[in-house]
Design a protein with these regions (language model features):
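Substrate-binding pocket helix/loop in short-chain dehydrogenase/reductase
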Residues: 88-89, 93-101, 189, 193
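Conserved Rossmann-fold SDR core element
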Residues: 150, 159-175, 221-228
Length: 235
């Protein structure tokens, strides 16, 4: 059996690490990137011999270029890495609104560009947006950024064909990101989400990773967005 190589930005934690586990467990190799050297080394120790990693700043094109410089041929790319804040429109906070696009939209845009030399006809790219694209609850810059990523997936699918490009749009997910927040903040957010999602609970990182893996593996899907959100966008 021939095993493939995948690159994951944000592969040292959360959904990215969950996908890396799934790929290495079936014998594929992964190149993971993350901001924290400590988290990166912990992830590499867990993933074992099929994993390699580099620190990377996804908001810096030169850092992205260095990350992909010796990546070699890639069967797929997943780009969930982002760190950002959201804000209300009436606040008029340009720095927060623009930094959100820099961290989440442009980072994925340029990641695909810098990965191009390693992509081939049967490669797949999975971007990551968020369910607020289809059902905003305020924070319009955040909603617009997620919608822009879904549009980017469609545009890239056309321009980069036969490379497949799709987008994973998760809802609130029980992850390290949320578990590191104060318990009262986390529980309040989860309760609110539970009242909106049809399945009445946040998602799990393994569920999101399984969806990303499906998009990487299914050669008949391109230019699509899958909402792994427990039916949130239907309410």
């Amino acid at each position: 059996m021939t095993h493939a190589r995948y690159a994951i930005l944000g592969g040292s934690s959360g959904i990215g690490l969950a996908l890396a586990r799934k790929l290495t467990s079936r014998g594929d190799s992964v190149l993971i990137g993350g901001r924290s050297e400590e988290k990166l080394q912990a992830a590499l120790a867990e993933l074992g011999k099929h994993a390699a990693g580099k620190t990377v700043d996804v908001t810096d094109r030169l850092s992205l270029r260095a990350f992909f410089s010796d990546a070699g041929p890639l069967a797929g790319l997943f780009t969930p890495a982002a760190s950002y804040q959201t804000g209300d429109f009436r606040d008029g906070d340009a720095a927060t609104s623009e930094a959100l696009f820099q961290a989440k939209f442009w980072s994925q845009y340029w990641a695909v560009y810098e990965a191009l030399p390693g992509l081939h006809a049967s490669s797949a790219v999975v971007l990551m947006s968020g369910a607020a694209s289809a059902r905003p609850i305020g924070a319009p810059a955040y909603a617009a950024c997620n919608a822009a990523l879904e549009g980017l997936a469609r545009g890239l699918a056309v321009e980069l064909k036969p490379v497949r490009v799709n987008c994973l749009s998760p809802g609130t997910t029980d992850s390290e990101l949320w578990r590191n927040r104060p318990a009262d903040v986390r529980e309040s957010a989860y309760q609110y989400w539970n009242s909106l999602a049809l399945n009445g609970r946040p998602g799990h990182v393994d569920e999101q990773a399984a969806t990303a893996l499906f998009l990487l593996d299914n050669h008949n899907i391109t230019g699509s967005t899958i909402y792994c959100d427990g039916g949130y966008t239907l309410r």
